[in-house]
Amino acid sequence: MPSNPSIDNAQLKSLYDDYAASKFQNFSYSLQQNQCNTTAENMYSLAVNCDNCSQAYKEWLCSVTIPRCEDYSSSDDFLQPRNAWQKFFNGTSLDAGNPDQKLAASNRSRSSMIDEQIQPGPYKEVLPCQDVCHNLVRSCPASLEFSCPQGTLLRLSYGQRSPNGEVTCNYMGAAYYLNAGRSIHEGLWFVSYALGIFWVVSWAYV
């Protein structure tokens, strides 16, 4: 997950956990406005219920609030550049005219909290899986107005699963391994992400 050497693990945990918990609390208030404990004929769906909606939201929330990251130097084509205008930890910046600096989606993180409170510098994100978003829409009442973007916005916001099992998009429980060719800097991203998953998995399935 996006991190910063100036922020210790305990503080990083608190930032992500508090942010996710506040989002989930707001969602819970909205879900409670629906008839969750009622007869089948009055439910919003016969196929899914509010428990399914809550679980789908937790899985989506964890995928989008704790991004899976790789070093900016990674060339995998499923990665989405982020924070191209920020400086790296060592104070250097991307070369002027870098094409990533011209795209709005490449110049900010998915969450403003990351840019404002963590300031991780440029990195590349393994986008959440499209099916995680689609499952959220299918599982929840229409009154919550969840929707997934379309076209180019979908491609910039969500990734697709690989048929060969490689992790090309982010979802809860995804296993990811670094090979020997990965950089030490990228290892920092991986260790931070693993810590984040440990923290959030325990929270998400309460």
Model region roles, listed by residue range:
Residues M1-L178:
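Mature extracellular/luminal domains of secreted and GPI-anchored eukaryotic proteins, especially small
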Residues A180-V206:
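Cleavable C-terminal sorting propeptides in eukaryotic secreted/cell-surface proteins
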